[in-house]
Amino acid sequence: MSTLVESPVPSNDSQAAAPAAYDPTQKQKSQAKTARIPIKVVAAEKLKKPEWIRVRAAAPGSRFYDIKRILREHNLHTVCEEASCPNIGECFGKGTATFMIMGDKCTRRCPFCDVGHGRPDPLDTQEPENLARTIAALKLSYVVITSVDRDDLRDGGAAHFVECIAKVREYSPDTRIEVLVPDFRGRLDRALHILNSGPPDVMNHNLETVPRLYKQARPGSDYAHSLKLLVEFKKLHPEVPTKSGLMLGLGETDEEILQVMRDMREHNVDMLTIGQYLQPSEHHLPVLRYVHPDTFAMFEREAYAMGFTHAAVGAMVRSSYHADQQAHAAGVN
């Protein structure tokens, strides 16, 4: 486990240790990534994982290695790999994946996330074509497309999303497309205008945690802005289901989670995912509690009582986990 402390003011003492040289062109992971955020992560005793936290390995004879090979051949990334998702064995084994576009270097440094930070490479103009060909080759009926944050782009990457959606529909017209988008902070109006030309079948943007914890968990993001993204998209496309997700175990209370769920419904969010946060490494935010299955069951009951069309709630649930089943249950066919 780890604890959090405010970053100290740099010392003028010549004896103070100098920080490692920072090369923005290189992908920073783990300690290299979190070393420069306002909240520092300090190693401490780990909580013991309870018996209900179990990761499923890929089954013998599954498509796990075949999927990895195809992704590398087409120069594609998945959030499953980059974020060290615990469900990767199960999902790859079943022939499903969440594709991550616009590179593997994020402009943010969220200390819960295992995606690398750095100066992103220029957009790959062949990526929409490569993505569409791969999805067609895999004969996928439902795909999730996500991305790193691209604060370096004037539209946050919205046009690239639209190009990818269009190409996938060209090659696989019956495939349903969910996008899990960044917050487009500072570029929201431009991004929404661009997305208007080619909206997905499901629009997903994760709030991740409660507003009180945004400073430590989502530096560079804003809770109210994320809600605005979801509700403004819904106003433009009332027929498209909207979706958001939360992770538990960062220090939130149950009542804070319930209030976020109410906020989602007040902003016309249709679908919900809630799962247990698992620390990718000792240099990431600590797990402060493992939520009991009974508590997850309570959140699920409350979600349906609030009017969510579908709620996937459980320790190993992730935003894209069984996304096709979630969408089908919410009426996306």
Swiss-Prot record:
Enzyme Commission number(s) from the entry: 2.8.1.8
Residues reported to bind [4Fe-4S] cluster 1: C80, C85, C91, S320
Principal cellular location given in the protein's record: cytoplasm
Keyword 4Fe-4S found: yes
Recorded GO CC terms: cytoplasm
Gene3D superfamilies: Aldolase class I
The protein's name in its UniProt record: Lipoyl synthase
